[in-house]
Amino acid sequence: MRHATSPIVFCFLIFLVMNHVKGQAKKKRCPIGLHTYGKCGTDRAKFCFSEIESKLSFSKQVLNTISSCRCDDDRQGNKDLYWCQCDRREGRPCPAN
């Protein structure tokens, strides 16, 4: 009987450890953003990356951590605006609000 209960107790302990680890999620990295006049290009992600690369002064090391970009068109009054946001794979986490 002792041999039968050992695996059950072991599985229960593993279950507790796995659930404890799930509660400690990785903090999200702060995105890089740009909001200015104009419109997104046809290839929105590529346009956004090139705009951030040319208009903001980030090192190549920071630019290499970018995993994805998105561009959203907006309109304020009679002026076109766009909002670029690029997410990063690594870097400093966003501060808690």
Curated annotation (Swiss-Prot):
Q: Which InterPro entries match?
A: SCRL
Name the UniProt key words of this record, in alphabetical order.
Answer: Antimicrobial, Disulfide bond, Fungicide, Plant defense, Secreted, Signal
Q: Which GO terms describe its cellular component?
A: extracellular region
Annotated signal sequence range: 1-23
- The protein's predominant localisation is secreted
Short name of any one Pfam family annotated for the protein = SCRL
Which cysteine residues pair off into disulfide bonds?
30-94, 40-71, 48-84, 69-86
Q: Where in the cell is it found?
A: Secreted
An annotated GO BP: killing of cells of another organism
What family classification does the UniProt entry report for this protein?
Belongs to the DEFL family.
PANTHER family for the chain: DEFENSIN-LIKE PROTEIN 241-RELATED (PTHR34450:SF6), DEFENSIN-LIKE PROTEIN 245-RELATED (PTHR34450)
* Full protein name: Putative defensin-like protein 237
- Organism (species): Arabidopsis thaliana (Mouse-ear cress)
